C-alpha cells in the first residue's frame, strides 16, 4: 500500500502570496509550453479503434477485490471507435466506491479525453449524481481513500461538470454548469498541483479547479462512471455497508469515450501553479492542454 506523503491543506484554494506581475515568480504565456506526447505515458493513450485495447485497462474491482459495479463495458463494439461504459447503481464520494478502470503511471501526467454522458433513454441522466469522466487515485487507499476527479453529467442538477478532491475519505466537490453533449475533460498533475479542466463542445478550455498534490508518485489514472445516488437511501450514511454489496436501484447513465490521451506536462521551478498571480488561468490552460486541442 502506498502512503500519502505529507498532508493536504487548503484543498481547492490558491495560495495568497502575490508575486510581482513582472517578477521572477510569474510564468508568462510566451514562456509556457504545452504538454509533450510520447514516451511511457504516450504509450498508454488509445483512440479505441480496436477491441483489443481492453487489455490496456484494469478494473479496480479485480485488483482490490471489490464488488464489480460495471453493468456493461466494451471497446469498439456498442459504439464504433469508442469506449462504452454503463455503471450499476454506485457512487464515488467520501468512502463510497464505484466503477473504475485504470492504468498505473508515474510522475507528472496529463490525461485528456472526450466524453459524452447520457441517460439510458437519451438526454441527461435523471437520477442524481449520475456522472462520468476521469479520475486519478492512490492505489490501495481503501480504508482512507485519496483521489481526484473531473466528471460530467447530472450532479444535484443536470448539465454539470463536477470537480472533486477526496483526502482520507473526505470529499470536497464543486459543480459547474456546462452545456449538454460532448465535453472535453483534462485531469493532470504537475509538480505540487493537480488541475482539472473542461471544455464544452466547440468552446474554450476553462480551469475547473486547482488543488495541492501530495499523493505518491505512482497513481491509477483512468475512467469512472457512477449513477443513482437516490437509491442509496439509509446507506447514504454507511459507506462500509454500501461497499459490501451491490445496491439495488435504477441506474441511468451511459458513457461514450472517444479517446483517452496521456501526455507529460512541465512547469518551470519558479512557477507556483497554486497561485493565480504566478500562473494565470490562461497560462495554466496552455501548460495543461495539448497543443492544438
Task: Report the location of each language-model feature.
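Sec-dependent N-terminal signal peptides
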Residues: 1-4
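Extracellular glycan-recognition regions
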Residues: 15, 20-293
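C-terminal motif of bacterial Sec signal peptides marking the signal peptidase cleavage site
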Residues: 7-10
